[in-house]
Amino acid sequence: TVIGLQYCDSTTCGTTGQKLLLLLFIVVGACVVCVWISLQNYPYPVWASCLASYLTLVLLSWLQVLTYFDYFFLCLIILGIPSVLLTLLIHLAIQ
């Protein structure tokens, strides 16, 4: 097991469709968050927070987080929280 959860490799952890759907949710969610923050703090640059979200997504995908957990929402939380936090940190740094 990995941190008490079911370990799985790329062949047994969910389907490709589930993973693609998860990535779609994350990408859309990251954009919604960064656009919302930007609209609240115009002329806060949208690209800065989106960049943070996508870099986080790319990094975690590269680390293959999606292949280690067999729980859809857990994957969503693991990938989503760092994106939101990075977005907020950049927002605070720019202010």
Swiss-Prot record:
Q: Which UniProt keywords apply?
A: Early protein
What domain of life does the UniProt record list for this protein's source? Viruses
Protein name stated in the entry:
Probable protein E5
Per the UniProt record, the source organism is: Human papillomavirus 42
